[in-house]
């Protein structure tokens, strides 16, 4: 039996799940209504459009990643320690919010230009946290002096973003082990 849920949060959560599973174009408002136990037209009492839902899911992904970066940057310690915190925060967001993250990483390109621009700016701000920490590490001695903050951030975020494709909580690798392995891999490449 389908339980009828009708809060906006329920609608956005269901949209994130369906966008993650079927993609933006593969998800219809009818699919979403069925998921929520609503008639298609009833859905419009909660949202203006499917694009509106995509915006909410993707912007939530951006907020979650930025909050994890802000927390990491607020910690005490060397840049290497902050980088480990950035990695742990990213992994935590991916593991705790798989549907939002999958939609953020894979479906943001489906946003209209205005919203895409905002999300790109948010993504750039998040990436800047990694660049900032790597640059700090080059100057405080905890990371290689010749590290390239821009390229090394791209490399590291490529690894971190790929986790959503293969990681399964019920699999052989636990979250703590995943954080340790990615951190050691990254820091192994960046230590002096």
What are these regions (language model features)?
Residues 1-6, 17:
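N-terminal intrinsically disordered/low-complexity leader segments
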Residues 10, 14, 18-52, 56:
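Helix-turn-helix
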Residues 50, 57, 61, 65, ...:
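Hydrophobic/aromatic residues within well-ordered alpha-helical segments
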Residues 52, 92-131:
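Short secondary-structure transition hinges
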Residues 56, 70-100, 149, 153-156:
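Hydrophobic alpha-helical connector segments
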Residues 63-66, 114-140, 150-154, 177:
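Amphipathic alpha-helical packing segments from all-alpha helical-bundle domains
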Residues 92, 96, 128-140, 157-159, ...:
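C-terminal peripheral helix-coil segments that are non-catalytic and often amphipathic
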């Amino acid at each position: 039996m389908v339980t009828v849920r009708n809060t906006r949060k329920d609608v956005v959560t269901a949209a994130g799940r369906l966008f993650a599973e079927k993609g933006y174009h593969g998800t219809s408002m009818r699919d979403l209504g069925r998921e929520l136990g609503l008639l298609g037209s009833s859905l419009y009492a909660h949202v203006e459009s499917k694009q509106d839902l995509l915006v909410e899911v993707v912007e939530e992904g951006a907020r979650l990643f930025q909050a994890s970066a802000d927390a990491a940057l607020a910690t005490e310690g060397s840049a290497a320690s902050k980088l480990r915190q950035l990695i742990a925060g990213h992994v935590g967001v991916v593991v705790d919010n798989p549907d939002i993250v999958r939609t953020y990483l894979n479906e943001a390109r489906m946003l209209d230009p205005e919203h895409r621009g905002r999300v790109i700016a948010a993504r750039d701000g998040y990436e800047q946290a990694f660049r900032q920490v790597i640059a700090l590490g080059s100057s405080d001695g905890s990371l290689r002096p010749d590290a390239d903050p821009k390229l090394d951030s791209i490399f590291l975020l490529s690894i971190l973003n790929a986790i959503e494709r293969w990681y399964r909580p019920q699999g052989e690798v636990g979250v703590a082990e995943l954080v340790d392995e990615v951190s050691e891999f990254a820091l192994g490449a960046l230590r002096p």
